[in-house]
Each structure stands twice: as C-alpha cells, then as structure tokens.
Amino acid sequence: MCKYGKSNLAAVASSTSSIIGAAAAAVAEAQPSASPSTSSSFLLLEVPFRHLLRLQPPPYFIAGTRRMAAQLDVTTLIAIVGFVFVFCLYLIHIIALSYSKYRLHHKVKEDSSLPGVSIIKPIVGKDNNLYENIESFFTTQYHKYELLFCFNSSDDEAVEVVKCLMKKYPKVDAKLFFGGETVGLNPKINNMMPAYRSALYPLILVSDSGIFMRSDGVLDMATTMMSHEKMALVTQTPYCKDREGFDAAFEQMYFGTSHGRIYLAGNCMDFVCSTGMSSMMKKEALDECGGISNFGGYLAEDYFFGRELANRGYKSAISSHPALQNSSSVSVSSFLDRICRWVKLRIAMLPHILLVEPLQDCFPSGLIMAFSLNHLVGLNIMPILILHTIYWFSMDYSLMNSMQNGKLSFSPLQFMLIWLLRELTAPFVFIKALLQPTIQWRNNVFHLAWGGQILPPKC
C-alpha cells in the first residue's frame, strides 16, 4: 500500500463531500421553482454543467491539495488521476440513465400554432426498408410541412420509390431535386443545397433516408424547438428500430448503450454533441451562420452546425422521441467500419480525444480503476475488475431498456453476448482508425485536416 494512500484518500473524500454540499446549495438557490414531479428528482439535470464549474472550492481544500501534491510521487499521482477519471465515467452512467428517464418518451400534445417544417431528405440508393422509412414521413401527424427529396441523379433507383409514394399521398406537399449544387467538398451539403434554398418554412428538418419517423416525431421536435426563444437546434437521440438478426441487434445495442450514454450525458451537461441523422434547426438562426453552404468544407457538418449556433448564443436540446434508424443492409463488419469512420472524424475535429477515446470503454477503464485502487489502498485487482464490469453491464442494460421504452427484441443472455463483442472490438476499431486515417464514405475518399476541414483531393 502507498505510504500516503489512506490519509490522502480521506482528505480527498472529506473535501469532495464539502464541494458536493456547496454545489447542491448553489444549484438549489439558482434553480427556479418547478413542478413537484421534477424539482426533487431532477434538479441538477436542469442546470447546465458549466454553472457548477463556477463554484469555488473552500480554502482548506486548496491548502490540503497543495500539501498532498508536494508529497506525491509520480506513480501515486497517476493512480489518483486514473481513479478520478474512471469515477467520472461512473457518474456519466448515472447522469445518462437519469436524464433518459427524465427526458425521453413523453406524450406530445397537438399544437396548430407551431410553425411549418421543411423536411429535407438527402437520398442515395435504396434498400428494402426505404419505402417504409419514407412513407413514415408522408403519414406524419403535423399540420404544416413539406417534403424535399434530394438526389444526385435522376437515375437513382430510389426516385421511383419516392414517386410511388407521392402518387399514394397526393395531398402531401412533396418535391424532387436533382443534381445538387456544388458549394464545397461535402457531398451531402451539395446534395441538399437546392432544397434548402427553396424551403418555405422557418423550421428545417434534415433527416437521413434510413430514419423511420414516429407519427408524432415531427410534432415532438417542433414542440421542443419552440419551448425556448433561443432554441435553434433540436436533435433526436440516435437509436434503432427493432429488426431481426444478430447484426441489427449489434447496431441497436451500440446506440442504446455506449453511444446513448455519451449523447444523453453530453446534452444534459450542455455540451455540443449534435448528430445530423435527424436534426431540426431554425432557418433564421442557420442563415445567421451563413446557411448550410457555409459548412460545405466540413465532413461532420452536423457537429459544426451545433458548435456555430452555440457560439452565437443559441441553445440546443434533444426531443422526447429517439431517432429510429431502420436500414435493412446492416452487418457487423459494415457497422464497425461506420464506427471507425466516426472515430476518425472525432480525432480530426478534436485531437485531444486521442487521450480519452481508447480509455472510456468498459475493460480499459476497469484496468485503470483496478490498478489505481491497488496502488492507492492495496485492494486486489480481480475483485475490482469484476465489480467494475458488473456495474458497467448493469448500467448499460438499464440505459438500453430506458431507450427502448418497452421489451427488448433479444434476451438478457443475448444482450450480454452482443455487449461483450462490442466492448472487445472497441479497442481494435480505435487502432484501425489511427492506422488508416483516410475516410471512405460511399464512393468518396476524404482526407481531413486538424479541425475537421476536408482537404482538396490531390491531383
């Protein structure tokens, strides 16, 4: 056991208790009165995390920390940092699960005073579920909207699917756009430009072709958008529609656990983590940022939409209903390639992610916690690893049940097997992203500069 282990941990525990007490008091004073159902259980969830960072630690905590730092050796310092890092990951689990209970799956009331919505659907190719996905937008329960379908070519095989639905629902205002408009190196932005320029309504919903929309999904997003005058971006938490097969279950499990945890916790703590598969924006606010053409030089345009809007003082939120991805062509290998592509994007946009990305999953973080506690207080490594894994698995399973809001399409045993596969493959996906930084998306190959900007192709 480390010479200073017990005394240091006791000092940290005492000081942390005081800080938590001060934070709770400050939040209670700053939070306006709320309904009894939310004020007691979810008080902290309504306060942006950045406000908590303004709290000043007590003087004795600072003095104690300085004394500890003067006595620490490098190994002990690394162990303390490791313990704090993994403890924060434990808190992220709790925040994500609590916020999912608070924010997701609420009933939405109809409101004819809400503004109209222009729904932009960029489409490339088709799969067996495309008809079902597109039809869910033709049947959406919203009083005023238009559907704007964007194709690179009139020869795209998905064009006939859309035309068939336009004939089936002639009362729905739907238009087709072909060829796009080149405003940058991002093909999705180029594809959407004609539709964006012709949009009639003040709210823009960008929705990928693989998204199935609940009948009240657009209403839910518009209601969230108009809940605050400074709200300019509303996204749906990425999830998946129930489908048969191991590959579909693997994809659904990822979005219901690892991805869902970070997305929900990030939105709760007011971080920019927007995703573009189903996102609604105020056109006026977006035009203030230069319109979507201003983001044609970035591959992850959805993230930069959110960042620029936040920089201009606008708010963002998630809607009550998750985005239901419903592609029929998913496979484990293609999905892992997709996740690898996202890792490459994050590394290019936020280089410091290199320090965190490979350590935030279950088994790497479990090893960090086990060796940290072994060094600090002499606990055996194996029991810590077992307890850590049980906690991680239990919280992931609980979060996925919350995201699902009903019975899962697979058993707990199947969930465990899929969960293990996902956790074991995560480090290899990260290594592949480091070794092969070039991004291949559909038929295009991209090279990114630090910061996420697309580099022009080499001649």
Swiss-Prot record:
GO CC term (a single one): membrane
UniProt topology in membrane: Multi-pass membrane protein
Enzyme Commission code: 2.4.1.80
GO biological process terms held by the UniProt record: glucosylceramide biosynthetic process; nematode larval development; regulation of mesodermal cell fate specification; regulation of protein localization to basolateral plasma membrane
Coiled-coil regions listed in the entry: none
Motif position, (Q/R)XXRW: 338-342
Chain location of the short sequence motif D2 per the record: 208
UniProt motif D1: location: 156
Residues at the active site: D302 (proton acceptor)
Residue ranges crossing the lipid bilayer per the database entry: 77-97, 367-387, 415-435
Location of the protein in the cell: Membrane
Keywords recorded for this protein, A-Z: Glycosyltransferase, Lipid biosynthesis, Lipid metabolism, Membrane, Sphingolipid metabolism, Transferase, Transmembrane, Transmembrane helix
Record motif D3, residues: 302
Highest taxon above the source species: Eukaryota
Pathway listed: Lipid metabolism; sphingolipid metabolism
Disruption phenotype: Reduced brood size. Reduced glucosyl-ceramide content and expression at cell surface. Increased expression of sphingomyelins and sphingomyelin clustering at cell surface. Loss of function in the germline leads to defects in oocyte formation and early embryonic divisions and shortened body length. Loss of function in somatic cells may lead to L1 arrest. Double RNAi-mediated knockdown together with cgt-1 reduces the rate of development and restores the basolateral cell membrane localization of mig-14 in intestinal cells in a sgk-1 ok538 mutant background.
Notes concerning its domains: The D1, D2, D3, (Q/R)XXRW motif is a critical part of the GCS active site, involved in catalysis and UDP-sugar binding.
UniProt family annotation: Belongs to the glycosyltransferase 2 family.
Its biological purpose: Catalyzes the first glycosylation step in glycosphingolipid biosynthesis, the transfer of glucose to ceramide to produce glucosylceramides (GlcCer). GlcCer are known to contribute to the physical properties and physiological functions of membranes and may regulate signal transduction. Seems to be the major active form in the nematode. Only branched-chain sphingoid bases like 15-methylhexadecasphing-4-enine are used for generating complex sphingolipids in Caenorhabditis elegans.
Protein name: Ceramide glucosyltransferase 3
Organism of this sequence: Caenorhabditis elegans
